[in-house]
């Protein structure tokens, strides 16, 4: 198999895992693009991205332009004379002149089965919608948002136990394997691109903290999907006793209830059962303000009086 001279562009840990796979391969990473250092932590100290840290540790030249729209940045990239540019969660828009610069163009690893869940939060939205499977798509980039021709797809079933955290880990393992497979096909000229079906496309909007508020007027199944989608961020929550209480883990109960949505039906070490518009949601792990996440048995030991049966939890509209 031919080795390729690669520019890698990415920023978070998810991207760094793909860079590590390239460094372990026969390909040559000749330059790394990543976001400028950002203030982080309580001291707001300028902090390098995980991708930059990995590149520096491996003595690879690092480029951190604030934009790739200006000619000097574009000329610097062209001077690297790369065969291909691999983009994984980079965070900057690539103008057409950049997309056309490498001999084989630019490819992207995206955490969904395109054209479903284009955009910023594909892992979370797949859980939020109750999808049964997700996966990774390697695509040839164009000027649209995740609209390029698909080069390779790998599939992953979504388990009932999955959260965004666990799916992230699974896709962070699957993505690098798919990337190396796609690069092999591109280097050998054996990979056929497939157009995306626009009729099947939808958009994975970024999550917001406001969206994580549990609305008991939804079904138990939808709320269960949201709890999993919003773990580990921003974490589903409800307001009660003047406090914001986060819900880290829940499941749909087999209990049947005609109580008003938001009514606590039972509270035991097995969970706190809450009536919804359709079905009952059992809360299993929660977090009180200023505390770490705890299982419900420990929560009830500390604040059992808050969760007495027939207590009504406030709804979003109330």
From Swiss-Prot:
CDD domains for this protein: FMT_core_Met-tRNA-FMT_N, Met_tRNA_FMT_C
Superkingdom, taxonomy of origin: Bacteria
GO cellular component: cytosol
Reactions that this protein is recorded to catalyse: L-methionyl-tRNA(fMet) + (6R)-10-formyltetrahydrofolate = N-formyl-L-methionyl-tRNA(fMet) + (6S)-5,6,7,8-tetrahydrofolate + H(+)
Enzyme class: transferase
Keywords annotated in UniProt: Protein biosynthesis, Transferase
Molecular function GO labels: methionyl-tRNA formyltransferase activity
Family (UniProt): Belongs to the Fmt family.
NCBIfam families referenced in this protein's UniProt entry, alphabetically: fmt
Biological role stated in the UniProt entry: Attaches a formyl group to the free amino group of methionyl-tRNA(fMet). The formyl group appears to play a dual role in the initiator identity of N-formylmethionyl-tRNA by promoting its recognition by IF2 and preventing the misappropriation of this tRNA by the elongation apparatus.
Protein name: Methionyl-tRNA formyltransferase
Organism of provenance: Shewanella sp. (strain W3-18-1)
Lineage: Bacteria, Pseudomonadati, Pseudomonadota, Gammaproteobacteria, Alteromonadales
């Amino acid at each position: 198999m031919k080795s390729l001279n690669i520019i890698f562009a990415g920023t978070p840990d998810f991207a760094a895992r793909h860079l590590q796979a390239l460094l372990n391969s026969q390909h040559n990473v000749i330059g790394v693009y990543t976001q400028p250092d950002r203030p982080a932590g309580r001291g707001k100290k300028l902090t390098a991205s995980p991708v930059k840290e990995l590149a520096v540790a491996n003595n690879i030249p690092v480029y951190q332009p604030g934009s790739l729209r200006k000619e000097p940045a574009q000329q610097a990239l062209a001077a690297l004379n790369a065969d291909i540019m691999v983009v994984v969660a980079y965070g900057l828009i690539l103008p057409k002149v950049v997309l056309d610069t490498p001999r084989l163009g630019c490819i992207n690893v995206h955490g969904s089965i395109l054209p479903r869940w284009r955009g910023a939060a594909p892992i979370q939205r797949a859980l939020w919608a109750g999808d049964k499977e997700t996966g990774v798509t390697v695509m040839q980039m164009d000027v649209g948002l995740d609209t390029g021709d698909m080069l390779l797809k790998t599939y992953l079933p979504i388990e009932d136990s999955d959260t965004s955290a666990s799916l992230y880990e699974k896709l962070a393992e699957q993505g690098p394997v798919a990337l190396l497979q796609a690069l092999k096909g591109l280097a050998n000229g054996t990979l056929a691109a497939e157009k995306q079906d626009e009729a099947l496309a939808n958009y994975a909007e970024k999550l917001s903290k406001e969206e994580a508020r549990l609305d008991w007027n939804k079904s138990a199944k939808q709320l269960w999907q949201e709890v999993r989608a919003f773990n580990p961020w921003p974490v589903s929550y409800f307001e009660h006793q003047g406090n914001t209480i986060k819900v880290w883990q829940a499941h749909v109960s087999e209990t049947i209830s005609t109580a008003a949505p938001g009514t606590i039906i039972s509270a035991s070490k097995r969970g706190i059962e809450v009536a919804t518009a359709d079905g009952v949601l059992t809360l299993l792990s929660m977090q009180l303000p200023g505390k770490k996440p705890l299982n419900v048995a420990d929560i009830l030991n500390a604040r059992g009086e808050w969760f007495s049966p027939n207590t009504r939890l406030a709804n979003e509209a109330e």
